[in-house]
Amino acid sequence: MLYIMPNAGVIPIVRFINNAKRDLDVNVYYLSDKPILNAVRYAIKRGVDVKIMIDGKPYRMSIRKEKREIKRTGAHFEIDKMFDRKYVFDHAKYMLDNHEALIGTANFDWSAFHKNREYEYTTYNKNIISSLKNIFNSDYSGVKFNGHINHNLVVSPGATQKILSMIDQPGSIDIETEELGYYRPILSALAKKGSAVKIIVPSSISNYDKKIIRFLEKYRVKIRLMPARTVYIHAKTIVGRQKAFIGSENFTYTSLNKNREVGIIIYNDQLINKLKNQFNNDWARCR
């Protein structure tokens, strides 16, 4: 199942939590949304064993209030110490129970579900759930993960090659991303693909990324800016003819090689078409 925000709102997240029966693991960069916290609280009252793990120092944020509110739900709570270093983050956005997983682009805050373009994907694939469970348990316990990663998952550190394979797939690709950044392998792949690439970024993109845009435009990459008053592009997606990517990864060196990030590769034609249609609608609203 694929959900598109802000259209879908917070309901899919709350429904996922409400459907949990025995356990629920949540790993998200930032969590402050009241309906989600309330759903967690009710899940614990039903007897669900809830574990929540967040980043300890989201960029330019103090999270003392957020930590206090999470603890008040009664959930088991940890800061991800495996990625608690300078300029390194637990930037993942996923949750799972014993039979379903949700992977997406949204932080769990009000803006994600009311103002942002975000994508959330749910799966019942047992192998994906098993991989995510092992990753979560390692990070939650503060132990380096060295296990098997399902081939459909895109997990950082070490996600560069899978993102390059998304860019290099035959045919045109459509990208929505909050930022670009100077990471030579990614920029070279985009430049090489040239006019077969369309990219949507928010109009508030940094001056540094504006330089990256000018570089890519020299290679005929098509780039448009989405006005923030329309919708804020926080999504991280690559959509091609054969497969699509949704995840927490920005296309920067740190995101792909240092952070904890989680994404998913989708091969379902119906969902790929849904993503393409949304991209085309967004493209038409850009400038």
Model-assigned labels for residue ranges:
Residues Q278-R287:
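Charge-patterned, long linear interaction tracts outside catalytic cores
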Residues V40, L187-L190:
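Class I S-adenosylmethionine-dependent transferase superfamily signal
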Residues T177-E179, R184-S188:
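Long, repeat-rich segments with strong aromatic
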Residues M1-K21, N27-D168, S195-D269, K276:
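HKD-type phospholipase D/PLD-like phosphodiesterase module
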